[in-house]
């Protein structure tokens, strides 16, 4: 069970703080069922309600600093997505995002970064699907790493680059 004040990752909402654990007084909602009341830290004014009894499938703790540093050092060995069919690739991106796994977000970022370079060299634009999933994966990854490493989100990318180049 998560505790009030704890940082968690919740689905596509990114890093959230557990604001409360309570029942809801809303019509049509089981008044006996407990919910985590989450506040996404990068979506001001948003609130997410997650039933406590289903949180195992949709929430997890934010990486520790040690786990974040290990993940960053493992980035060069994380494989690319090797699907060439654009429709299947979008399904794979979607599946990777749903896993709520930082390594899967890195796979998306690495794959799209290389696809983007190839398209630019060929005089073509980045696809809308690639742009969308690149942004989503970066937002989720950098948001979580910023919390884990206790640094501003806008410094995460340069930190990763420095650590990999060591």
Regions found by a protein language model. Name each.
Residues 1-57:
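A positional/architectural concept
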Residues 53-166:
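Charge/polar-rich, low-complexity and marginally structured segments
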């Amino acid at each position: 069970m998560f505790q009030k004040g704890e940082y968690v990752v919740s689905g596509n909402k990114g890093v959230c703080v557990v604001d409360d654990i309570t029942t809801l007084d809303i019509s049509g909602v089981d008044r006996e069922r407990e919910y985590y009341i989450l506040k996404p830290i990068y979506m001001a004014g948003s609130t997410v309600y997650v039933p406590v009894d289903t949180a195992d499938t949709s929430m997890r703790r934010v990486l520790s600093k040690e786990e974040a540093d290990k993940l960053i050092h493992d980035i060069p060995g994380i494989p690319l997505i090797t699907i060439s069919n654009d429709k299947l690739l979008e399904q794979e991106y979607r599946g990777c995002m749903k896993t709520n796994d930082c390594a899967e977000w890195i796979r998306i970022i690495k794959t799209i970064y290389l696809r983007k370079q190839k398209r630019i060299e060929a005089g073509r634009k980045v696809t809308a699907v690639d742009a969308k999933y690149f942004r989503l994966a970066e937002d989720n990854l950098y948001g979580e790493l910023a919390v884990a490493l206790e640094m501003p989100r806008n410094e995460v990318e340069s930190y990763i680059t420095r650590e990999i180049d060591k």
